[in-house]
């Protein structure tokens, strides 16, 4: 019998060991910081194709996530004059009800992707939506302005768990040929959420007062979270990474900031978005005073240009 047939499988040659490692059929090294606690094997990703039932469920679920996230963020913008009167604060101070939310949102987005690698994509997005919606229900019950601001800041911190993680989920699960379509559906949810959150709350405020209007947006967020939980399929291609690998993420962030062109892109986006939000923050004060004297629902309609 040829000598190569007499070799034991338990003691492969160097060539065999290299071939085996390339196929990744053996467990990952225990001292690998990115190794999973479970045995992982490298397999071809199972993409979700456009037109399939799973694709439709994902599209609807992430549309709801985008809608809820941005309606909760921006629903206070038309209410800033009302909040200034109720809490006896000036226009600049009242704008903190939105500025703190968006500021903490930006901070949370930097961390959300890393956290989701340890907790799971769907779980983090669902928890973020539920907690933020509950905070939006609590906010109108508060009589202290600073407590109101704390709740709004926490709301932004929680909502940061949706935008970055939603994109990561889509990139992992959707067929690359249909990824642009799936991301477009999610982004349309954010745009419609930001618009309707501003417009709907204006009509609700005229009918029921700002307390009920703001609480209603929180209830709507919980309904969206329920639909998200039911519709979004479990991840197929996600590989959990235990712990928070801070050094890995610090290197990634440093790479973005030291890039020759990216910091300028970041600054352009920050300044453009800052100007956009600031104009809409203060236009309500001008339109609610003489000589215009517009109602909350009329002020809300101004945001249709958004």
Where do the model's predicted regions map?
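Juxtamembrane intracellular "pre-TM" segments in multi-pass secondary transporters
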Residues: 43-52, 233-266
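Extracytoplasmic
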Residues: 57-91, 112, 279-285
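Residue-level signature of mid-helix packing/kink "hotspots" within the transmembrane helices
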Residues: 74, 102-110, 194-195, 306
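Interfacial helix-cap and linker-helix signal at transmembrane-aqueous boundaries
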Residues: 83-84, 115-116, 200-208, 288
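Conserved MFS/SLC helix-loop-helix module at the cytosolic interface between two early adjacent transmembrane helices
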Residues: 107-145
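Short hydrophobic/alpha-helical segments at membrane-entry points of transmembrane helices
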Residues: 144-152, 265
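Helix-loop-helix hairpin linking two adjacent transmembrane segments in secondary transporters
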Residues: 147, 176, 185-232
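Cytoplasmic helix-loop-helix junction between adjacent transmembrane helices
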Residues: 151-190
